[in-house]
């Protein structure tokens, strides 16, 4: 069960980035692409935040998991939340024709999404002897 939520995150990223976005880009003109994709990204990153929170809860409840799992779950929450928060600024830069700002924000979003993918792929292989501390009085 530990790997369930990271697996969902990996699957969602692959589906969105490798299938949905390219298909929309190829089939819609730029105006309709923007209208269609804008409502999807906030939902996508919000979903990744929620899945990452569930992953963190799972890690917390299973003391046999390592500190690395905790780091992956917390990092996933932070990175997805940052991507979510910068969406309005990215859209504003696009609307205002500010290509430089758009390029920077888009690069951050893409980079963080790739890091999210790598971290969550690494989740099942990061079992080590470095385990989370458990309370001695429970």
Where are these regions (language model features)?
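Acidic interhelical loop/turn segments
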Residues: 92-103
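Mid-chain, well-packed structural core segment of small domains
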Residues: 65-93
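Individual transmembrane alpha-helices with interfacial aromatic-anchor signatures
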Residues: 101-116
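Conserved small/polar residues in nucleotide/adenosyl-binding loops
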Residues: 128-134
């Amino acid at each position: 069960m530990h790997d369930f939520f990271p697996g969902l995150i990996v699957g969602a990223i692959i589906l969105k980035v490798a299938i949905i976005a390219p298909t929309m880009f190829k089939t819609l003109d730029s105006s309709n692409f923007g209208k269609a994709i804008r409502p999807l990204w906030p939902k996508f990153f919000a979903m990744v935040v929620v899945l990452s929170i569930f992953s963190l809860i799972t890690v917390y409840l299973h003391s046999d998991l390592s500190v690395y799992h905790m780091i992956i779950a917390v990092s996933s929450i932070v990175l997805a939340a940052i991507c979510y928060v910068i969406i309005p600024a990215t859209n504003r830069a696009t609307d205002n024709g500010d290509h430089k700002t758009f390029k920077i924000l888009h690069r951050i979003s893409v980079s963080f999404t790739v890091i999210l993918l790598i971290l969550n792929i690494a989740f099942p292989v990061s079992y080590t002897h470095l385990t989370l501390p458990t309370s001695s009085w429970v």
